[in-house]
Amino acid sequence: MPRPTPGKDWLAGHRTEAAADRILDAAEELYTQRDADSIGMNEIASVAGCSRATLYRYFENREALRTAYVHRETHRLGRAIKQQIDGVDDPRERLVASIIATLRKVRDSPALASWFSITRPPTGGELAGQSEVIAALAAAFLNSLGPDDPAVVERRARWVVRVIISLLMFPGHDEADERAMIEDFVVPIVTPDTVNSARA
């Protein structure tokens, strides 16, 4: 696919959101090739077909761009996973299904999977572990499983994020093995107390 030529008309006909997405798409293309830490703003601007000045108008530095990319993909994954588990009613089964779906979708994306490769710097794990957006989405999902103390839900959400990061970086033998670990060691701790009490 031919790349656009940098110029003053780069934003012509583009809204701000569309222009930012175009830059993030360019970054994604590069993320599939090399680890994120080795990719500079010059390269991203070149692939996006815009000037450095335009790039910095949207993202003040590389860290801001990477964070924006992770958050965009998090929202996309969230919507896809929500649709996938829509027919699962049992809270415990929904939790397992959502984690398995998250692992599968990240691994199926070359750009996202590269962030969690143990042969590269742990950029993906660090960003995911520190992201308030990811933590908030995880907390909202856990809260949908059943009511519980907000502080407890927040801690459980951060724990789930760490479990997912761990499995992405250090996978189980196969999906069945990972499912068993989630059922044995995550579900009993993370599902709301009301759900566990009802199952007792």
Model-found features: residue ranges?
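Short hydrophobic clusters on alpha-helical segments that form packing/core surfaces
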Residues: I23-Y31, L77, I81, T102
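Short hydrophobic/aromatic patch on the recognition helix
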Residues: A48-F59
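Hydrophobic alpha-helical connector segments
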Residues: A68, K82-D108
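Amphipathic C-terminal alpha-helical segment
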Residues: R104-D108, N143-S144, R158-D177, P188-S197
